[in-house]
Amino acid sequence: MGYSSFLEIVKGRFYADTISRFDQADISHLFVDNSRIPASLTKKLKGVDLIISFVSDKGQIMVSNLRAAGVKHVIHYEPFPSEGEAIHVIDHFLRCLDLLGVPYSNKIPKIFLKDEDIVFAENFLNDRVDDPKKMLVTVHPGSGNRQKCWPIDRYVELILWLSEKINAHVLIISGPADRENIEELKVKVKNSFILVDQLPLPIVAAIIKQCNLFVGNDSGITHLAAAVGTPAISMFGPTDPSVWGPRGERVKIFYRKSPCSPCSFDMRKNCFSNICLEGVTVEDIISEIRYIKQYNL
């Protein structure tokens, strides 16, 4: 259960048989203390043996309501590690398996795509790529938080280098929070990229999987790139990559720790200098791309 636009990446793709929207009206009753749970919701929940929740619920109101509604077992963790806790977010999520005694050996996320996802991606690229022999590079210049974004002028310089110096096809991924950055890129790099605009996550993942390289910020799309196995370069600044960094065998993270980094959400919200990300240069990224090309990684 969650937001359907996110959960599509697992529905019928190995991890989930069915999904349920979190933004249904009756769900809101779970967050009200001593709530009278609607019969429609109680009917759904009574047949559930176990719920593992990563919803913020510090007062345990939701947990209490779930148990009152008939759920046999509820395991709850806050959605993120406590601030200052030295644990990667993936290891935080895996705590529930430790509690249940479920063994696991691999801590690297992997996305499984449907054949139809791959076919859509192939058709998308065939319609837009004039030379399939050229290097395909996906770039995501956005993030859910502007302070986590590498400066847009550096993306401009990188995109122009990719298209003009190594003759690569550049695909720019645009999501709901990226409109401002995309409009600026359209002005500054003109027709030097192919826009991947507002597509469902399984399709975005399939397109990235077809590419030779991904470059992006600390964002969910970067984790997606790592999970499909595409070589990924990511720029971190205000957040700690040892906690939030994408995991993968082909991931390179650039992080230039500054005196104020990593910082709290409140500090980040009021920061307009982003000196932590200023320390990552275009030449850093170009050097890594040259290395990847040289060794065909």
Locate the predicted segments by residue.
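Catalytic machinery of carbohydrate-active enzymes
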Residues: M1-L297
